A protein has these predicted regions:
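Hydrophobic, well-ordered beta-alpha structural blocks that scaffold small-molecule cofactor pockets
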Residues: 1-53, 58
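Structural motif
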Residues: 12, 68-69, 95
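Redox-cofactor binding/interface segments in oxidoreductases and associated redox assembly factors
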Residues: 15, 71-72, 98
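Short, acidic/turn-prone active-site loops that include or flank metal/cofactor-
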Residues: 45-47, 63, 99-103, 122-127
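Glycine-rich, highly charged phosphate/nucleotide-binding loops
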Residues: 50-83
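ADP-ribose/adenylate-binding Rossmann-like module
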Residues: 87-114
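Short, glycine-/small-residue-rich phosphate/pyrophosphate-handling segment
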Residues: 108-157
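Conserved anion/nucleotide-ligand pocket segment
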Residues: 138-203
Length: 216
């Protein structure tokens, strides 16, 4: 399958390295690709819990059980560390798109030996724009949820629910963040617990909203 065909069929894209710094290429890529139908998932450990244009930033990609595409904007050293950790965890490995500057001979050797499909030497954004590539079957926009540690002294967990596109600049300790799709499929502890609280006849979105604190 060609890159163009694959990208048109792809629905979710994890932008590894996309944080709040608007000068960074990963952040700009997120902005440049808006409107092309992809469910873009920004990943940045320091800025996790805040949002880019109403989309929550994840601290890592582990919430996704079956990701489709990682577009990586990291140094070669950090890229290789991420890939090794992912493979060792025995998770389903997505297609890896190495942005210019993220690749190295060691990374390419690792990917080839592991049999992981990948692209290198080409910018994902430029490839999509020059070839007019968009997602053929976009996913619907969904709510997102957040669990933080209370800062009022009791150290309790605080669960919040946000409609699609809601912006937030987080200033509290993060416990978990993700959208409704992550909440539905993640094997992490907090999503599993929230799913266990679903009542008969209640959707997961309704459960997440019922458990949330009222908006301030």
């Amino acid at each position: 399958m060609s890159d163009a065909s694959f990208l048109r069929q792809t629905k979710s894209v994890h932008i590894i390295g996309a944080g709040l710094n608007q000068e960074r290429p990963a952040h700009r890529a997120f902005i440049d690709m808006k409107g092309r139908g992809y469910r873009m998932v920004p990943v940045h450990p320091r800025d996790a819990g805040s949002t880019i244009q109403g989309v929550p930033i994840l601290p890592h990609p582990w919430a996704s059980v079956d990701p489709e595409l990682f577009v990586i904007f990291l140094s070669p050293e950090r890229t290789l560390g991420l890939l090794r950790k992912w493979v060792v965890s025995n998770r389903n490995t997505p297609f890896i798109w190495l942005q210019p500057g993220a690749e190295s001979d060691d990374i390419l050797e690792f990917l080839n030996e592991a049999g992981i499909p990948h692209s290198s030497g080409k910018c994902w954004v430029v490839t999509c724009i020059q070839n007019d590539i968009s997602c053929e079957d976009p996913l619907p926009k969904v709510p997102w949820v957040l669990q933080t540690t209370s800062t009022d002294g009791d150290h309790c967990s605080v669960w919040r629910y946000f409609p699609p596109g809601t912006d937030l600049n987080l200033d509290e300790p993060l416990e978990w963040v993700g959208d409704l799709m992550d909440l539905r499929s993640s094997d992490e502890r907090i999503p599993r617990y929230i799913r266990s609280l679903c009542q008969d006849g209640e959707s997961l979105a309704e459960t997440a909203q019922r458990l949330a604190i009222p908006p301030s």
